[in-house]
A protein has these predicted regions:
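Periplasmic OmpA-like peptidoglycan-binding domain that tethers envelope proteins to the cell wall
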Residues: 30-38, 50, 56-126
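Periplasmic peptidoglycan-binding/tethering modules of Gram-negative envelope proteins
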Residues: 1-54
């Protein structure tokens, strides 16, 4: 599988964790920006060239706000990415989405920079 340098993937547990650092969301938002769509388009190309792989799309948030709202927001982030890929032509059977809310931060939520990193979507290839 040929992968962009910015993309580290876990494929059948042979690679390390997967994250797209540039796929970060504004606070309290699950709207895809133009820059987010460009990153997702890279995933689309990978899926187009490698029809044997599937993707788990994981949504995450920072810890600002209520836990339940953050959980729903993270689910909506993952679903927005999934729906975008489906609109591009990826079969829904190759995509799963899940939201974790604030349960799996990449960085401690101690400042705005760390919190921005935690408002993200990760892609797991399986």
């Amino acid at each position: 599988i040929t992968l962009p340098l910015m993309l580290q993937l876990r494929f059948n547990n042979l690679f390390t964790s997967s994250i797209l650092p540039s796929l970060i969301f504004p606070s309290a938002s699950f709207e895809l920006t133009d820059s987010s769509k460009k990153v997702i388009d890279e995933i689309y190309l990978i899926l187009l060239k490698n029809r044997e792989i599937n993707v788990l799309i994981e949504g995450h948030t920072d810890n600002v706000g209520e836990f339940r709202k953050n959980l729903k927001l993270s689910q909506n982030k993952a679903l927005a990415v999934k729906n975008y890929l489906i609109q591009r032509g990826v079969s829904a059977t190759r995509l799963r989405s899940r939201g974790y809310g604030e349960k799996r931060p990449k960085k401690p939520n101690i400042n705005k920079k760390s919190m921005a990193i935690n408002r993200r979507v990760e892609f797991i290839i399986y």
